[in-house]
């Protein structure tokens, strides 16, 4: 049976989620606690401690020293003559813990069950009965002779043996633990204990420093009696027990029976150990309930709360923090200085520089240690109360435990913990006192008006200090449920008077009067003297812990989880309104719905990203610890929801990776085409399939150079990342004004790296890549070719193309036009001037000038029609190597996109001209690009309204809005009339300029061909008819001239590669016809010439029009 039990325990240790450090990100640690968090909460241990070994055991305490004999025979039986407690023994890295309460390692364990103990005091909180002993305080471990397989371990501690002075008749603390389990389980536990004991020996010096600061050590070591005798030179001064040693403790020591309490605690310490080696028995809880002696109060607070264990790790942390940040200033220090003189002014110690200085140093040190919280309201009151009974270092560590574990969220920027407990308190009042709750609601009395200061100041500001400290005594032992029990008891006792109040003022007055009479008798008219001796405060404690004993930690936890979301939403809603209200003037360009959507999405992405990063970091740390030792596999869990606004200080800046996720949730072009490996690995490796539902549904973000430029553009400080203000300003510039010129300028500025208003060759190519990246997922109907454009050239195959294919052609045209209208840089201009001067000098040379003049394109035609010379095959090039190099260099130089020696750039006016010259690009910047950022539904509906630029008259919509299709309208002259067609816009203007240049070049070429052929006829002495020669020359010259003109123009504009030029099928037929003419005989040529000459003579203007049509067809291809 024992083997089966150990097997089940081992299986549970492997199944436990804490082994994998996977917190439930959708819930808090109270709702689904890990084994490690339960263990630390149960024994009040630092966050670095994890459960390594556990076993069922029985604690055997020695008999009382007063009843035991000093004889050797009886001393042998001391280990078996005292109280016996059955429970569970736990081992961590630096502590050995024993508890009689239900263990946190049960399969059905929760944080509430692990902190509940139904003993004589009706719930003693997380500490329970048992001990929490540092391993460094164990002096010796012996295995006793026992029956059969039982392992009996005798532990001897350093209790009372670390000081220089020891009390006469000192007896070391010794107790026995019997392990209950299989032999293998017991040996495994003993092996782990032995290993950790050796590692903890180096911390004995830290234990010595901590113990010497405890008043119990001074009290029981005999140093107090020596100090009272003035003749003893070796007497050491008592340790610092707070400002009360200098300015007296609150209350009358005689009425409080301080001496009697001190004697009771001294006796308990002698029998059960003290400070770090204290064993908790039921008497321990009773002594705390009746009140603590003044000089031992600070030490007992440390032991009960667990801050002593925290101070043991680094005893000099407080002094080191003050020395490290000495002389530095911060915003928290400024707030601290304002509240110093308002901290318990009724106590004399805080009216002097001594008390003010102590308070300043503790608050300042904590603000540097916990920079996220820094300093918050009411923290000065709590610390001032602690300093009355504790030293500065003790108050510093207790404040840390108070803020982080006992009342988390009470002292933060949002005070979400206090507000949450107000909801819990109201729900408990409604449940336990429904009549009073209904009356307060009918009278419109806010319960939080009086209860909020109770919880925030831990009743220090509400009750007289003497009674407030009695509440704190039980609070540090049993936890925050004491605050609710005392509050409910106050309302129950004053219920009859509270039913008569009608407003907040009278409500506060009744309770204030009650607090001022807490020292009076609760039954002044009673004839029973014992009953008459009971004070109102004693009555309050009895009602709190008896009538409201059903208020347990489980009750508080359930109510907190019930109201947590609503409270956080209220806090975050208030923070949202405040943040939006404080945004800059750029936010006025966006609607309130859009601003709200940006805020929600910004913090949702940031919160989710911070959570994943936290878990990934913890996973990495766990893997590192796993490599070094198996016992450290169980890592600390993520107890706090990182990044949520309502929980206090949270990250306010997002880095580039978080910005990618924000864009992916805002614009569909920012979504990756396929999930990246890093995201897959993060989802499967770090979370092991237990990630958040929202994170799993969120698409994977893309990573493009455009998104990086957008991040740098929006960020005011790239090192810190993007703030909410930066994101709002960036989106407002795009979606706010709805101005196409603004959008074009914004896009241009993204690629203006130097800020000089110029975009170079690489920038043009990256612009085109960005356009393709932004348009790869469609346009959602924001880009539609106009009907007039579709009817401009009916019957074209391009009309059957989709919008995406049309946009692809527009981007291609964008690249060509950018390089065509790009300006050369300064160095290029100087080189061109030098080359032009050289060409002018060379133009006066005599030789082959005539051949150069007509070498525009005829060589290609002649080389195809003229037979090759002997010794050359048709495939052999006829050009010399130098001529080929010259041709290649000329071709590259003619294409701006291929010539790296001639850097080019475009300016903003050129970029605007090229964009506005294309209808799809114009719609892209006017509609799609700003509307691609989807924010809110109302914002999307408003985006469908006509923009500012749509009401303007541009080249693309000129006459479109006002043009009415009527049958009887004035005849509009076409291009021949010198009027640009309305729907052609700026493209028509640019294309007509190019067409006129081509037509002029064709005419010049034609006349040069005629002059050349005339010279050839004179040289050959031909007797042909002049009219036939003219017709023949007209036929052979016109077509090649146009073809040559187009070829030379295309090479200059688009490059020398013929595949890059857009040539219509009719032009290709014309080229084939020219080849046939050159091959055929002379007679056939004359017949064709007669036909062509006849057609030319019949319509003198048709040839020019035909040539114009061919050229215009070339320009139409230029648009696509």
UniProtKB/Swiss-Prot annotation:
Q: Where is the composition biased (Low complexity)?
A: 864-878
Per UniProt, the ranges with Basic and acidic residues bias are 1057-1068, 1081-1095
Q: Where is the composition biased (Acidic residues)?
A: 1023-1032
Task: Give the matching Pfam families.
Answer: RabGAP-TBC (PF00566)
Q: Where is this region: Disordered?
A: 673-702, 859-903, 960-979, 1017-1068, 1081-1120
Q: Which Gene3D superfamilies match?
A: EF-hand (1.10.238.10), putative rabgap domain of human tbc1 domain family member 14 like domains (1.10.8.270), Ypt/Rab-GAP domain of gyp1p, domain 3 (1.10.472.80)
In terms of InterPro entries, this protein maps to:
EF-hand-dom_pair (IPR011992), Rab-GAP-TBC_dom (IPR000195), Rab-GAP_TBC_sf (IPR035969), Rab_GAP_TBC_domain (IPR050302)
An MF annotation (GO) of this entry: GTPase activator activity
Positions of the Rab-GAP TBC domain: 291-479
Tell me where on the tree of life, at the top rank, the source sits. Answer: Eukaryota
Q: Where is the composition biased (Polar residues)?
A: 960-970
List the PROSITE patterns.
TBC_RABGAP
What protein name applies here? Answer: Putative GTPase-activating protein AN11010
Organism field: Emericella nidulans (strain FGSC A4 / ATCC 38163 / CBS 112.46 / NRRL 194 / M139)
Q: What is the lineage of its organism?
A: Eukaryota, Fungi, Dikarya, Ascomycota, Pezizomycotina
